[in-house]
Curated annotation (Swiss-Prot):
This is 4-diphosphocytidyl-2-C-methyl-D-erythritol kinase. GO terms for biological process: isopentenyl diphosphate biosynthetic process, methylerythritol 4-phosphate pathway; terpenoid biosynthetic process. It catalyses: 4-CDP-2-C-methyl-D-erythritol + ATP = 4-CDP-2-C-methyl-D-erythritol 2-phosphate + ADP + H(+). NCBIfam families: ispE. Belongs to the GHMP kinase family. IspE subfamily. Keywords: ATP-binding, Isoprene biosynthesis, Kinase, Nucleotide-binding, Transferase.
């Protein structure tokens, strides 16, 4: 095992649309969505330790360590290796993890899920576990429905509970992502009795052709009813380009053909909001970073 620090990106995602097409007997929702990766996000650094401790700095406000997806991902991977490859268990060291956090929590842009995926990918490499992507994605699904798309590292059309992924190439666009400084509970939205749960299944074609007019986020109506501040933010952004919610929020977004226009709108954003401009990408930077690490 190389005793040096591995630093990897942890990109954001948008749900360009989100259709809820049914509900399974176990309570999980069937959905269709287009996960669009962005060239903006957190970064995580992993440094092997001489002991067996797994530590994270800085700790995230309001998130107990046991509930942090980064720590949970590290422990899950360690348990999996110990159970399935006892011969490799001796290679597992402790690890100090440092996060440079840019993405808001509870924003619907995949911050926690992306962090978990990056942790699985990083420690698989640091611990020389040689676990394939399929298995890592399955482990990721235990942590959250959005984790597998980040493990696979590609913009994708998703079905099932978000775990059946079809990689796609989307047209390059610039996005302005606005966070109205609210935290929205995904569980609260998905349990709301007024949530649309019977949207007819769509094909992948409209999403790829950019025909988002006929696609929507089924959570948006419920979220806007519960949180009028989200409707207010959407109305503001709508002045410049059609805006919509990503995931269950709280972030909203709009697309622009060029960076300059997106940055101009960002400069006009009310000070009560936070926001950033990012370019769409079809492949996660983590994949290339891991290749460079291997060749380093």
């Amino acid at each position: 095992m190389r005793n040096e620090t591995l630093t990897l990106s942890s990109p954001a995602k948008l749900n360009l649309f989100l259709h809820i097409t049914g509900r399974r007997p176990d309570g999980y929702h069937e959905l269709q969505t287009l996960f669009q990766l962005l060239d903006y996000g957190d970064s995580l650094s992993f440094t092997p330790r001489d002991d067996q401790r797994i530590t994270l700095e800085p700790s995230l406000p309001g998130v107990p360590e046991a509930d942090n997806l980064i720590i949970k991902a590290a422990r899950l991977l360690k348990e999996h290796i110990t159970a399935t490859s006892p011969d490799k268990a001796g290679q597992i060291s402790g690890v100090s993890i440092y996060i440079n956090k840019k993405l808001p929590m509870g924003g619907g842009i995949g911050g926690g899920s992306s962090n978990a995926a990056t942790t699985l990918l990083a420690l698989n490499r640091l611990w020389n576990a040689d676990i394939n992507t399929e298995t890592l994605a399955a482990l990721g699904l235990k942590l959250g429905a959005d984790v597998p798309v980040f493990v696979r590292g590609a913009t994708a059309f998703a079905e099932g509970v978000g775990d059946i992924l079809h990689p796609v190439d989307t047209q390059e666009k610039w996005y302005l992502v606005v966070h109205p400084n609210l935290h929205i509970s995904t569980a609260k939205i998905f349990s709301d009795k007024w949530l649309t749960r019977d949207t007819p299944k769509s094909t992948i074609a409209p999403a790829l052709e950019g025909d988002l007019e006929n696609l929507r986020n089924d959570c948006e109506t419920v979220v806007c009813r519960m949180y009028p501040e989200i409707r207010e933010a959407i109305n503001w952004l709508d002045q410049f380009s059609p805006a919509r919610l990503t995931g269950t929020g709280a972030c909203i977004f709009a697309s622009f053909s060029d960076k300059k226009r997106a940055e101009y709108v960002l400069s006009q954003m009310p000070t009560k909001y936070q926001g950033f401009v990012a370019k769409s990408i079809n492949e996660s930077p983590v994949l290339n970073e891991l290749k460079q690490w291997r060749n380093h």
